[in-house]
Design a protein with these regions (language model features):
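Walker B beta-strand of ABC/ABC-like P-loop ATPase nucleotide-binding domains
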Residues: 193
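Walker B catalytic acidic pair
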Residues: 196
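Active-site-proximal or metal-binding-adjacent scaffold patches in catalytic folds
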Residues: 1-190, 200-236
Length: 236
């Protein structure tokens, strides 16, 4: 019996069966969705993946190239965001190194001796540390709020620098979120938090799961679409 891979070219493979008559592939965020008729067997799904392997690989390369084109310079004046609010990087020399938010500026201090690529690397590191710290605090607040509403009890919350996914929930109720998520507007962040908490009720992406998400986020389809369209820019 053929086994459907869980991951392909860095994308999570998600099979969605329905009453549809044809099979189709979509790349949505960090997921490769295979939408097939109910009658289609796993072996046929594997054949579809093998047939479309070149297309999938080329799409992944295309998305990676888009991210490279939008590569950051980490210089003063460069724009960042926090819950949809525009912030601007301001690089200073000397004093205590690190990043702090003052008004609309991410004040990032580096050593005078750090120049060129080393300076960019340090600025990136300081910014990521700041974002991770902020993400943990803000996401913990949102998880606590929505876990009471949804009536689930997550065991642990972590923040990581995921390359493709926005969040995850394992079978022990441990939640992990991408720190880049807090660059999105609040309603988008709320959607991802609700999404992962609903996985504590239903681990897959079945119709029942999406019905649960809709109970707590009636506009989840719009939020999901926004994330698909703007996700690559948030990851920068």
């Amino acid at each position: 019996m053929s086994v459907i891979p869980k991951e392909l070219f860095g994308l999570r493979v998600e099979v969605l069966r329905s009453k549809r008559k044809t099979s189709v592939l979509y790349i949505i965020g960090d997921e490769l969705q295979i939408r097939v008729p109910n009658r289609v067997r796993d072996r046929k799904i594997v054949e579809i993946l093998e047939t479309k392997e070149r297309w999938i690989r080329n799409k992944v390369i295309q998305l990676q190239n888009q991210r490279i084109t939008n590569k950051r310079e980490f210089i003063s004046g460069e724009s960042f965001s926090l819950f949809g609010r525009n912030l601007y990087l301001k690089v200073l020399e000397g004093g205590k190194v690190g990043t702090q938010l003052i008004d609309d500026y991410l004040i990032t201090t580096v050593r005078i001796s750090e120049i060129g690529d080393l300076r960019k690397s340090r600025i990136k590191t300081y910014l990521e540390k700041w974002y991770i710290h902020e993400a943990y605090q803000k996401l913990e607040e949102k998880v606590m709020r929505y876990s009471k509403i949804i009536r689930v009890s997550p065991r642990e919350i972590k923040v990581r620098n995921y390359k493709t996914r926005w969040g995850s929930c394992d079978n022990k109720g441990r939640l992990t979120f991408n720190f880049h998520l807090i660059k999105a507007p609040h309603e988008i962040v709320d959607y991802v938090v609700i999404h992962e908490l609903c996985h504590m009720i239903q681990p897959n992406h079945s119709k029942f799961f999406w019905n649960e998400v809709a109970r707590f986020d009636p506009s989840f389809k719009n939020h999901k679409k926004w994330l698909k369209l703007n996700g690559a820019d948030l990851m920068r």
